[in-house]
Amino acid sequence: MAKTLSKPASGALAPWLGISLIVILFDQLSKIAILKTFAYGAQHALTSFFNLVLVYNRGAAFGFLSTASGWQRWAFTALGVGATLVICFLLKRHGHQRLFSLSLALILGGALGNVIDRLVYGHVIDFLDFHLGGWHFPAFNLADSAITIGAVLLIYDELRRVRGAR
């Protein structure tokens, strides 16, 4: 009887892609609801520090490059697709590392949520507006939230891993 020397996969991709899909679903449904409810620039105060508002972001985080001539749409789309490929590779390779994989799944879902916006609308739909007094944090969306939470978890996981190695 011959033995196979194939190496088993170190992590299952499906559960992590499932989490990413849930992020994309909630992100896109929330944006559809805002687009159907609000006119561009309209805002609805929910608390003294939080509004729902419809704004378009043609750039990246905090409106970076939002006034560029249009090339940024395709550059940020390509960046999102490239990140998707790298993240899928990492998830396949490290799927057994739960916190690491969860953080990547959140980042992946958020990145693809914003890529979908860029491909469908030509810009990202932002609608969560936190403010205090006259100061407003730049509006963002659920995809951005997932990316941020994923990044924080990724840093936490790395710090935990490094401390454990000491």
From Swiss-Prot:
Active-site residues from the entry: D126, D144
Top enzyme class: hydrolase
Keyword Transmembrane: yes
Biological process terms in GO annotation: proteolysis
Alphabetical list of InterPro entries matching this protein: Peptidase_A8 (IPR001872)
Principal subcellular localisation of the protein: membrane
EC number: 3.4.23.36
Reactions the enzyme catalyzes: Release of signal peptides from bacterial membrane prolipoproteins. Hydrolyzes -Xaa-Yaa-Zaa-|-(S,diacylglyceryl)Cys-, in which Xaa is hydrophobic (preferably Leu), and Yaa (Ala or Ser) and Zaa (Gly or Ala) have small, neutral side chains
Pfam families reported in the protein's UniProt record: Peptidase_A8
A cellular component term, taken from the record's GO annotations: plasma membrane
Compartment(s) of residence: Cell inner membrane
Superkingdom of source: Bacteria
Keyword annotations from UniProtKB, A to Z: Aspartyl protease, Cell inner membrane, Cell membrane, Hydrolase, Membrane, Protease, Transmembrane, Transmembrane helix
Functional pathway: Protein modification; lipoprotein biosynthesis (signal peptide cleavage)
Bilayer topology: Multi-pass membrane protein
GO function terms (MF aspect): aspartic-type endopeptidase activity
Stored NCBIfam families: lspA
The protein's role, per its UniProt record: This protein specifically catalyzes the removal of signal peptides from prolipoproteins.
Family: Belongs to the peptidase A8 family.
PANTHER family the record matches: LIPOPROTEIN SIGNAL PEPTIDASE (PTHR33695:SF1)
Name the UniProt record assigns to this protein: Lipoprotein signal peptidase
Gene (name only): lspA
